[in-house]
């Protein structure tokens, strides 16, 4: 049996991408952002189609993402941050709440969000992961923006088929 299959599309030309970057653990977050922006450019996203905003910490990321999503100007969003374990429960709170908020915004607004908020045990782990995670966030944003647009067209095609059937009746 042959089945239809969507092939991943990493062509970024014409896509509008919003990035929200935490300033807490700034060296790591700057490394994430540098790698992400470099990869977006490699994928064909124009610098004029990227907006980067910064927020104090990971817990503020969801609100900024929500504001960008509400604008309707973006094909995908990216969350960048670093939560590094300390000696208190705060690590779990920030990790869980920021992640849940990021996911909720994407689902509420039907908008892809690449979550590149690192959660690590120490600074060394964060530094070791920042470059590849930044690049990965760019690839996820571009691929998911293209996928959601392609899937949205499926709905448009079904509406056209229904309109054709009504015209024939």
Swiss-Prot record:
If you read the UniProt record, what top EC class would you report for this enzyme, in one word? transferase
Q: Any idea of its EC number?
A: 2.5.1.78
Transcription listed as a keyword: no
One GO CC term of this entry? cytosol
Task: Read off the InterPro entries from this record.
Answer: LS, LS/RS, LS/RS_sf
Q: Which residues bind 5-amino-6-(D-ribitylamino)uracil?
A: 24, 58-60, 82-84, 115
Q: In which pathway does it act?
A: Cofactor biosynthesis; riboflavin biosynthesis; riboflavin from 2-hydroxy-3-oxobutyl phosphate and 5-amino-6-(D-ribitylamino)uracil: step 1/2
Function statement: Catalyzes the formation of 6,7-dimethyl-8-ribityllumazine by condensation of 5-amino-6-(D-ribitylamino)uracil with 3,4-dihydroxy-2-butanone 4-phosphate. This is the penultimate step in the biosynthesis of riboflavin.
The similarity annotation says: Belongs to the DMRL synthase family.
Q: What is this protein called?
A: 6,7-dimethyl-8-ribityllumazine synthase
